[in-house]
């Protein structure tokens, strides 16, 4: 669109990337471009594409026109300069870390994040020489003390998983930038409709598009958004981006791609070599979800408020962990960063232990017991024995996950039916 700043979120989510109908067919909907490769006009055109002088399609592992619309749209919604869609959220996170840190280098990360990200940082990446320190990001002194000479990024989530704890993004951005580091934020649970981390100092945003962006539990996908705010050339700490890269005939990505150097590096090198490519069909389905993102999020938030009120008044509930509550330690940050509400994925502690948690979960009907979240359908799981089961008892305690912790993902069903289903679960607890 001529100027994305002139349009509201609800308009951008429908139009960015396909301002005019498809030129080949006049189709209004974004077509699924089911092709592996693309015809070049002539030899010079092919050379320009491979040399990054012309940013168009080269090969399906790197780009696809359906994928391109999706990337442009999410980048616009986040306020970034470029997007890169990949096969899953895990791929988006992995590529981002691999693009920032190499063998012998280090990442500082929030400890209360998705269990899969903890495993990646603590177990998988160390096999490739990348170490991590997980910290309590509410203790800013602890964050700063964890930064070493070889630290390459600070990694956090807008809403922690599973307890929806909230970091002070602006304070952490200040620390990261003071040490010449980019701030990376996983905004999967926040969504750009509720919070745009780049506006608060983040440099790179990642998403599991499988969640709220897709919204319907049908499609895996991930997105990396380059904020275009970090000066890779001035930093001098990321030579594979700012200096001649021997893996791509000596190109300097900061010169070839300008503000979009980070996203371009991942596409041209990491995606090229390891191939976690999103399919055109997956990109199409995620675009369908994107077009209703604001409408769905409003309903998720509305329903969540009513579920929290119900749980607070239930005698079988020991504690509700939600940042909207005045006694939550992150309540002030919630009001500051989420003025329109949020955190439809949260936990509560049932009175008792694992037995009572299982009884409650196993007697729900509308809530589906599965590992996904952020679906239009309401979901439930027991984190300690599933999504976070690879963590040690000490790590679970640090993350605020107990035997009686239950995670809810509140969907868009009628609220009366959601509450009635929760009643069935509690009635089964002896």
Where are the predicted features?
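Conserved PLP-enzyme active-site core in the AAT-like
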Residues: 2-4, 17, 21, 84-314
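Glycine-rich beta-alpha junction loops
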Residues: 18, 34-40, 228-229, 242, ...
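Well-ordered beta-strand positions enriched in small/hydrophobic/aromatic, beta-favoring residues
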Residues: 154, 222-224, 320, 346, ...
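Conserved small-domain helix->loop->beta segment predominantly found in fold-type I
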Residues: 274-277, 281-283, 288, 292, ...
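N-terminal glycine-rich, Lys/His-bearing helix-loop that initiates the first secondary-structure elements
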Residues: 1-57
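PLP-dependent enzyme catalytic core of the Aspartate aminotransferase-like
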Residues: 2, 10, 122, 149, ...
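Conserved N-terminal alpha-helix of the aminotransferase class I/II PLP-enzyme fold
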Residues: 42-91, 116-123
């Amino acid at each position: 669109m001529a100027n994305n700043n002139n349009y509201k979120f609800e308009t951008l989510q429908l139009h960015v990337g396909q301002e005019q109908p498809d030129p080949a067919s006049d189709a209004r909907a974004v077509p699924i471009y089911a092709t592996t490769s693309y015809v070049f006009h002539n030899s010079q055109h092919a050379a320009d594409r491979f040399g990054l002088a012309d940013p168009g399609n080269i090969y399906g592992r790197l780009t696809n026109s359906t994928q391109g619309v999706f990337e442009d749209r999410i980048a616009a919604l986040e306020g970034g300069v470029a997007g890169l869609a990949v096969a899953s959220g895990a791929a988006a996170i992995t590529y981002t870390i691999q693009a920032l840190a190499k063998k012998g280098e280090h990442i500082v990360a929030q400890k209360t994040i998705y269990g899969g990200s903890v495993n990646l940082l603590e177990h998988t990446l160390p096999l490739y020489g990348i170490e991590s320190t997980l910290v309590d990001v509410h203790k800013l002194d602890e964050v700063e003390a964890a930064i070493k000479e070889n630290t390459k990024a600070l990694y956090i989530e807008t809403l922690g998983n599973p307890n929806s704890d909230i970091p002070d993004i602006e304070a952490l951005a200040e620390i990261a930038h003071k040490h010449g580091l980019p701030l990376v934020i996983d905004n999967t649970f926040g969504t750009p409709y509720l919070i745009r981390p780049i506006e608060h100092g983040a440099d790179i945003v990642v998403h599991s598009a499988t969640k709220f962006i897709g919204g319907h539990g049908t499609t895996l996908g991930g997105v990396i958004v380059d904020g275009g705010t970090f000066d890779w050339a001035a930093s001098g700490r990321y030579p594979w981006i700012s200096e001649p890269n021997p893996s791509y005939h000596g190109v300097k990505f900061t010169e070839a791609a300008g503000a979009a150097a980070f996203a371009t590096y991942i596409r041209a090198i990491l995606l090229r070599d390891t191939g976690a490519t999103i399919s055109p069909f997956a990109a199409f389905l995620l675009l369908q979800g994107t077009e209703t993102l604001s409408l769905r999020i409003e309903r998720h938030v509305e329903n969540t408020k009513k579920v929290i009120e119900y749980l607070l008044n239930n005698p079988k509930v020991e504690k509700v962990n939600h940042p909207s509550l005045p006694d939550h330690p992150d309540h002030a940050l919630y009001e500051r960063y989420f003025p329109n509400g949020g955190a439809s994925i949260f936990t509560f502690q049932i009175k008792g232990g694992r037995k009572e948690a299982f009884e409650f979960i196993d007697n729900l009907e509308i809530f589906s017991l599965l590992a996904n979240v952020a679906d239009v359908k309401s979901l439930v799981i027991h984190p300690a024995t599933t999504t976070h089961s690879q963590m040690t008892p000490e790590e679970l305690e640090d993350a605020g996950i107990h035997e009686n912790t239950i995670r809810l993902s509140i969907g868009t069903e009628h609220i009366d039916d959601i509450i009635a289903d929760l009643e069935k679960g509690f009635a089964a607890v002896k």
